[in-house]
Amino acid sequence: MNYVIIISADITVHKENMNMVEYKHYVKSYEAEVLKVFTESFVNYPLFWGVFEDRFKSEEKLRSFYERLIKGIFRATVRKDDCYIGIENGKVTVIVIVEKPSDKPVGFWDYAVSGMAGIIARIGLRDTLKYMELSDKTEVVVKSIPEPRWHLYFLAVDPKYQKLGHGSGAIQDFLIPLVRSNGGNLITVTTNSEKNVPFYTNNGFTLIKEETLEYKAKTIGNWSFRMDL
């Protein structure tokens, strides 16, 4: 794939065969569309869906809970970390959320003001805190790295555009140039989906640890990666 990459203060544009993905900073006016793509991208993802599958009597109730959870996670994360959206033919197709070395971590207060009360009402305070503890454990390995790092928190691609190279393009032609242009030389990422492992290794990440984490009676895999630029 041959891309022309145009970088300005706020926008990166990729052109391939006259198709264009324009990356820009997320702004509130895109919230409804971005939340739709973000929500649809992570259906069945182990950390956000799988650990709760046995908790609800119907898939409809599970879906309702999942949507509340994932929207709250998005809103909490973008309070601290940079969010970029890839727009193609006027539609949001890709979402990239990245934590810079200077960013403060997302904390309980960020979640509290982003809809956490609705989660507590459905699964209780104790299980909510246990879930937050599980989420923290997914990042223990990468947070132990002493060098300054850029962390790819989320890479979401609209399901209608998956397997078309959008995810790889977001890493190779947007994220890596973004990090390099800001003086960075290390990117980390974690995933809880085994099918994502070859995606990241094929895009230049090195697997540094594979582990199993527990939440109540459920277990999920956790894979941690780094890319040295």
Q: Where do the language-model regions lie?
A:
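Active-site rim helix/loop that mediates acceptor-substrate recognition in acyltransferases
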Residues: 56-82
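Conserved beta-hairpin
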Residues: 79-96
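Conserved acyl-donor/pantetheine-binding loop and adjacent beta-alpha core of acyl/acetyltransferases
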Residues: 95-156, 214-216
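Conserved acetyl-CoA-binding loop-helix of GNAT-fold acetyltransferases
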Residues: 163-177
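Conserved active-site alpha-helix within GNAT-family acetyltransferase domains
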Residues: 193-210
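A short beta-loop-alpha structural element at the N-terminal edge
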Residues: 21-36, 40-49, 100
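Conserved catalytic-core motifs of GNAT/GCN5-like acyltransferases
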Residues: 188, 206-224
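Conserved GNAT acetyl-CoA-binding A-motif
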Residues: 149-150, 179-192
